[in-house]
Structures are given as C-alpha cells and as structure tokens.
Amino acid sequence: MKRPSGRAADQLRSIRITRNYTKHAEGSVLVEFGDTKVICTVSVENGVPRFLKGQGQGWLTAEYGMLPRATGERNQREASRGKQGGRTLEIQRLIGRSLRAALDMSKLGDVTLYVDCDVIQADGGTRTASITGAMVALADALKVIKKRGGLKGGDPLKQMIAAVSVGMYQGEPVLDLDYLEDSAAETDLNVVMTSAGGFIEVQGTAEGAPFQPEELNAMLALAQKGMTELFEMQRAALAD
C-alpha cells in the first residue's frame, strides 16, 4: 500500500500551530494539518445561557464554518442560504462537546466561551484540526481571563484535548487522512482523546464492506500514537 502523499501508514501530516493569529480574540490560532488550514478563535463574554443562570458555572459553545472557496469548487455561503447544513451542525456540536471535556465549568465563573473554527482551506480532517487547534486557543483565552482577575476558584483546565482521523485505506490502517485518502477509504474514523488517555468521542463509518473488530483496534492504536505526537505539539506551542 502506498499513500498518495508518500507518508508512512503511521505518519501525521506536517502540522503547524500558530498562536495569537488574530488581533482581537482572547485566544486565536491558525492550525495547519498539511493543506488543511483552520483559524480557531476563543472569545470571552460575561454571563451564561439562561439554562445555567444561578448555577455557579460557566459555559462553552462552538461554531464551525468554511469559506466558500476552501474547497476545489466554490460552495455557497450558508448565511446566503438562510440556514446551516446538517454537516456543519454536527461538526460544531462535536467541537463544543470535545472542548467542554477539557474544563471544570464550576471554576470558570459566570463566563461564556465562544469557540469559532473557520476553515480557510480544506484537504481532509477539518473537524479534527479544528478541535486540536481550538484547544490551544482555549488555553490562551483562560490565561487572559486570569490576567483580568477572573478564575478565582482555580484553574478550570483539567486536561488537554486533541483529535485525529484514522481509516482503512487499501486494506490497511492509516493515520491522519487527507482528502484523497478520505474519499477513497473503506473506513473513516474520527477520534477525540484527552491528554490523560481517555476517549471523548469515536465516530466511525464504513464505506462498502463493514470493518472488523481487529481493524477497529488497529485504527484506535494508530490514533493513540498520533495523539501522543499532537499533545506534544500543543505543549510545545503553548511553551513558546
């Protein structure tokens, strides 16, 4: 089996995490997984949604979108259609669920964190890149809240979160699929994990033939290997 990119089966794409990418947001990152590029920002606003009023905890929510020409052909803006598509809603809910697992909301205070992930170029794995990059932007936003005199109850960051795709490509498990691989893969799996080694989400779909238990185990092992590298990249980015 030869991957279109020439990478080894267990090799991530070239990954870059650029912090403080935009001027105004409390946390901002440009994350690049190969040719997939996503701007991730975290904005801090006082107050929480109505369903959390008086409960003494904060909240985090996420939105996701793609520029019209992030892909090979122009896509109509969802705003011009008047509604978000099902894929967009699914991905932004995944991002929100994943990042909430990083936080102790009771220590966040009366604050809402708005995570925005905007894909400026797509070449596969936009949701996993979004989660991995937004986690770094979230860590930076928490530092800003602390500098402003917040977080009196302690650090709400429990653990780091990252995500990566794995799949069965030409009968073999591979890590971090690009678009060419993703579009031809027999199985596509998105995995979200904590830096402590726990799984937050595993999304898997077979195309054509079902995948077998031993293939699932092989893909998860590959994802865990990739996560080790991603968490190290996040730590290195935050140490700069």
From Swiss-Prot:
Concerning InterPro entries, the annotation shows: ExoRNase_PH_dom1 (IPR001247), ExoRNase_PH_dom2 (IPR015847), ExoRNase_PH_dom2_sf (IPR036345), PNPase/RNase_PH_dom_sf (IPR027408), Ribosomal_Su5_D2-typ_SF (IPR020568), RNase_PH (IPR050080), RNase_PH_bac-type (IPR002381), RNase_PH_CS (IPR018336)
One of the GO BP terms on file: tRNA processing
Q: Which residues hold phosphate?
A: 87, 125-127
User: What would you give as a GO molecular function for this chain, any one?
Assistant: tRNA nucleotidyltransferase activity
Report the SS bond pairs. Answer: none
Q: What is its EC number?
A: 2.7.7.56
Q: What's the catalysed reaction?
A: tRNA(n+1) + phosphate = tRNA(n) + a ribonucleoside 5'-diphosphate
* Top-level taxon of origin: Bacteria
Q: Which UniProt keywords apply?
A: Nucleotidyltransferase, RNA-binding, rRNA processing, Transferase, tRNA processing, tRNA-binding
Question: What Pfam families would the database entry show?
Answer: RNase_PH, RNase_PH_C
Identify the Gene3D superfamilies for this entry: GHMP Kinase, N-terminal domain
Q: Where are the transmembrane segments?
A: none
Q: Does the keyword rRNA processing apply?
A: yes
Per the entry, what this protein does is: Phosphorolytic 3'-5' exoribonuclease that plays an important role in tRNA 3'-end maturation. Removes nucleotide residues following the 3'-CCA terminus of tRNAs; can also add nucleotides to the ends of RNA molecules by using nucleoside diphosphates as substrates, but this may not be physiologically important. Probably plays a role in initiation of 16S rRNA degradation (leading to ribosome degradation) during starvation.
Q: Relate the assembly described in the record.
A: Homohexameric ring arranged as a trimer of dimers.
The record's family statement is: Belongs to the RNase PH family.
Know the name of this protein? Answer: Ribonuclease PH
Q: Which gene encodes it?
A: rph
